Amino acid sequence: MSDSDSEFSIEDSPKKKTAPKKEKASPKKKKDDANESMVMTEEDRNVFTSIDKKGGGSKQMAIEDIYQKKSQLEHILLRPDTYIGSVEHTEKTPMWVYNMEESKLEQRDISYVPGLYKIYDEILVNAADNKQRDPKMNTIKITINKEKNEISVYNNGKGIPVTQHKVEKVYVPELIFGTLLTSSNYNDDEKKVTGGRNGYGAKLCNIFSTKFTLETSSRDYKSAFKQTWIKNMTRDEEPKIVKSTDEDFTKITFSPDLAKFKMKELDDDICHLMARRAYDVAGSSKGVAVFLNGKRIPIKGFEDYVQMYTSQFNNEGEPLKIAYEQVGDRWQVALALSEKGFQQVSFVNSIATTKGGRHVDYVADQMVAKFIDSIKRKLTKTSMNIKPFQIKNHMWVFVNCLIENPTFDSQTKETMTLQQKQFGSTCVLSEKFSKAASSVGITDAVMSWVRFKQMDDLNKKCSKTKTSKLKGIPKLEDANDAGTKNSQQCTLILTEGDSAKTLAVSGLSVVGRDKYGVFPLRGKLLNVREGNMKQIADNAEVNAMIKILGLQYKKKYETEDDFKTLRYGKLMVMADQDQDGSHIKGLVINFIHHFWPSLIQRNFVEEFITPIVKATKGKEEVSFYSLPEYSEWRMNTDNWKSYKIKYYKGLGTSTSKEAKEYFLDMVRHRIRFKYNGADDDNAVDMAFSKKKIEERKDWLSKWMREKKDRKQQGLAEEYLYNKDTRFVTFKDFVNRELVLFSNLDNERSIPCLVDGFKPGQRKVLFACFKRADKREVKVAQLAGAVAEISAYHHGEQSLMGTIVNLAQDYVGSNNINLLLPIGQFGTRLQGGKDSASARYIFTQLSPVTRTLFPAHDDNVLRFLYEENQRIEPEWYCPIIPMVLVNGAQGIGTGWSTNIPNYNPRELVKNIKRLIAGEPQKALAPWYKNFRGKIIQIDPSRFACYGEVAVLDDNTIEITELPIKQWTQDYKEKVLEGLMESSDKKSPVIVDYKEYHTDTTVKFVVKLSPGKLRELERGQDLHQVFKLQAVINTTCMVLFDAAGCLRTYTSPEAITQEFYDSRQEKYVQRKEYLLGVLQAQSKRLTNQARFILAKINNEIVLENKKKAAIVDVLIKMKFDADPVKKWKEEQKLKELRESGEIELDEDDLAAVAVEEDEAISSAAKAVETKLSDYDYLVGMALIKLSEEEKNKLIKESEEKMAEVRVIEKKTWQDLWHEDLDNFVSELDKQEAREKADQDASIKNAAKKLAADAKTGRGPKKNVCTEVLPSKDGQRIEPMLDAATKAKYEKMSQPKKERVKKEPKEPKEPKKVKKEGQDIKKFMSPAAPKTAKKEKSDGFNSDMSEESDVEFDEGIDFDSDDDGVEREDVVSKPKPRTGKGAAKAEVIDLSDDDEVPAKKPAPAKKAAPKKKKSEFSDLSGGDSDEEAEKKPSTSKKPSPKKAAPKTAEPKSKAVTDFFGASKKNGKKAAGSDDEDDESFVVAPREKSGRARKAPPTYDVDSGSDSDQPKKKRGRVVDSDSD
């Protein structure tokens, strides 16, 4: 319908309406006092005239002029601030506006009239309210005509009723828009979510307008209405009523009375503010298209509206992130980071609550609660106590809500005051929102603010004045001029320890103490870039350096004046010339760069270098400042052996005389760090920032590749300090010196793939092999020997820890301990922390060790050299990948590694498969003597479960813990925590008893009454009692054979690469053995020929000169000593490959001999030649006897036979021999350990039995106290579909997670309620697992006491590493017999090595009242067999042959089963082969069942790979 008056024609009103057709309601007919008072003269309307001026001059005012009564309309115009706010322009205030000219939202300082803005807003809110009255409403049109001073607001949807009010005798549109104190919101019993409340609203807009036009059309009343008011609602025109079309709408057009607002026109500020309000409505009104000046506002919803704000800002260059959530139909909330204190944008029923209110507090408080716990956890190491308002200061909250009957602090409705309980709805933020909120940057912003606050506190501790004398800093040797006017010329020397300080002080004697100060650092400086402020504030070295240098945190030192406040003008680092010394230099540079980068740019930092090697010959002295420089000199100097070589591993090696020499040649030893631009800044940041992990990886990877290439090309290593080096850039220092420490840090932390060792472990093994001790040796003594033999330059305490770790054999440590633990080396009680002092415990090589590292391999390894001393090899080469046998953990620079343990016997089989050219079988983590269960979640994760069983309605028994969960920690952190109660919850457990030993676990736990039933209904007991963990294989990082770090995706990949390296060594070993045997054979042949020639007088040596003897032997074609020559060739080959030259005793003697004492070259040559034939001429005369002659000839023939045997053998044969020898020795060693463990358990049980009170009756079983109870109902751990799907989803790429959900495995069969067939109570997943075992290729001898299952999965990629203590949620599991836990093993191979066994004879059923006698070390029948055999069948089922690959069955114990409730007879068909031996548990009503006791393995056979099981060992109940 058109807006023009011409379209309205005067027609008769509808019959049902009583108002006259065209008659205007005169003022006389209006009975309302307020309306009568609305008829005023021009003088009456001039309400802004000052009352004080009415009287004029000084004439005293009349009482009537002082005390006046005003009408409602007069009061509104006279005191507008009560109703619409101020009518004065505000001061320039930052506000969000929409710039219509540039079409963008912006925040700028504006000045506007709040009253004018309010009357516009009242009309806009009315339009938005109509959406609540009529959900079909979908359009709002806003027009702001600046030139005409005209604003219109149109909305469709249900119009105003066009009918006469029967009480007030006026039309309803006129009543609600032209009569004060009228409203539809006076019924407080009606719950409304609209903006109107007090009955002013649009009337205020009418009153403050020179013209106000209302147009509405009502489809229900089939009429359209139009009326105009002028002169501040004091005059109104006749309403025009016409028949309407089918359209419903309402339109308000008004011209604000600018004079009342002291304005001449609608300025840009108010227009832009009104435009932004239009955008508010568009964002807060769902399903409504809003048009502004004819153009649709492009906002689809509240989230789009929020992004319109946040897109104006960024966080460290990235767009601001938002967390958004719609809660129900009435709440929409969003959160973003605020850098300007707490900000909020909120709407209540479309009203813009610019000052917030209780709705904003309600939402913001929830958001703060989400953050405060995580932030407090991060601040645990600091002294800061964060408050909620401090978090709130970094939040930008957006709220759009619908509130029932809201109340406000004033008519301006800027603050909502309604209490939260009256909102009519709740807004509970979800975990999904919390997760999104954690990524918007608020936590980081709060932490940054905390650091700033702490920095401010730190700065308060800094000295504000420059002083020449300092007190309270121990060991400081202050420069005399420090802190004076000459302080810029002073240099502070930071030394690495007290010994280096002594060296520096000695050197100062030649340069003076006026300009140089010395301060020793204790160890390595803190990495301040990643340390928290509390660490920095508490760090003595940092505080001392700041005080000595006169630094202040708040100063940047960018100006000369600031720089002059320092006590020293230079900082010089004097550290050892090794990698750790480089790290100290880097940390000092990092300290200055982090807080005062401008000092780095001023070249404030220097270093003092000292020689690492000196070569001396007479008065000539050559100094070398890096090992590569020394190696290069040695290669280019023919007579280098004539020099005396001395290595300087630390500054303490230098003498005071040498210190003076260093300081005299300050030009050579003083190296300045030169700033060379942003590249230097980036290099320092990359080396020390936690955020640059990936960059550090790339940096180190590139360096390792370059090192490998140079090595392959035979090039020397690069070094930083040449003879003419006077300065280095920070980038060069990081890339060419600091990188050496970072690589060394990785070598110390991450093992090598080939031998699985870190350098310390390799040194220990090298020393043990070299010592070849036949007797046990004290650990402390062995550590000292290792340091001496292998040139170990660090503390021996670390070596002692390494030795102890190599000898530990408790569950979760080593699968094969290479050293024997003779004494207390730690147990699973405290994870090895309970080991005795190294002074009291002994060790020696394990018999298994040399079978893993054959002595023959020592001849083909590449040994390292240090200080001309042959030390450990680059890596050993065991016969199987030891890194998989014992696992590995470590955190280096840029990388970390975590590799679980695997079964050595399975590794032997995989190696044999590779030798035979067959593919490997999949491996699962395996830990020696672990009685729990390991189930595969996906290709890179395994769930590790402990063991729990139910003893009665309120008692459970825990007999195994997950890997790496130590007994003492479990008791303190889990069980004691479950004993705590709260007001709302009773404790889970009331008591527990401990029966474990140092090798076994047993907790008997008493639960609160009824708690067990409650837990079983809701959760898995493994979850409740923290008996589950996750083992990840996603972080398997190792050094390869070439010394480069690589990431491996599976143990099979590691085995394959190991196989390639090991194969090459077997080829080399064969070549070496052939060479040495051939040399020995040749030597014996020469000796035999020489003896025969001497006997036959063909050789006469008596009374001849040495030279003549040599000539005779050469003439008769006797070879120079073949063995000696061959060994010398091998030694030279090794030295050439290593790039080192080892000085033997002759070389060392030659160096000490002066030139004038040297023997002639001719005589020396004769001596050398004669020594080559000493093996002939040096033989004893007894060798000429017939017996010795024949013995020599026989030895020669035997040696030739050995050569022929070796020639026939392939490298495969050599490897097979080593593997078989290893397995044989391992079996013997484990048998000895098992015997010792059984004896230990038996002794412990006897002690417990003796201590217990015993009554009359049969003797108590001594093993029941420490071993699993025979009557326990084992809870079978299972991985349910939901958990598996969770990990599959975690491992998918982000895009794939949305599009494609992982395929869930089939749900296990559910346990039926009582009355079902008892066989259904067994573990539902067992039959499926058994079927998969064969296809997956598992072998039952993988473990006798662990349980490993593989489930199908997809290939994933994950960054998780380590054994995580995680809730692997699974459904409640059925219970099975306790004994089944100890031998459930999955066969990882297809080898049919276990022969089928005949079924065992049937067993008799026991009376039900008698408890089943479980063997604590026995297993039961397989679950697969149970499904095939009903236990309640009336007819006895025929015996079936055992499956081909089934485990051997054994005789049963008497009274194996419990009889039925009706009688004590044996159930029909229940024998060992046909009955699963399930009986209904006493607590049958709960729906649980108990698996009957397992059988003893009395006389079972064994295959070649599995040692014969002893009586009482477990029968594998689930393997094929």
Curated annotation (Swiss-Prot):
Cofactor note: Binds two Mg(2+) per subunit. The magnesium ions form salt bridges with both the protein and the DNA. Can also accept other divalent metal cations, such as Mn(2+) or Ca(2+).
Site (Important for DNA bending): I891
Subcellular location, principal: nucleus
Keyword Metal-binding appears in the UniProt entry: yes
GO CC terms in record: chromosome; cytoplasm; nucleoplasm; nucleus; spindle
Keyword Isomerase carried by entry: yes
Family: Belongs to the type II topoisomerase family.
Full protein name: DNA topoisomerase 2 top-2
Species in which this protein is naturally found: Caenorhabditis elegans
Gene: top-2
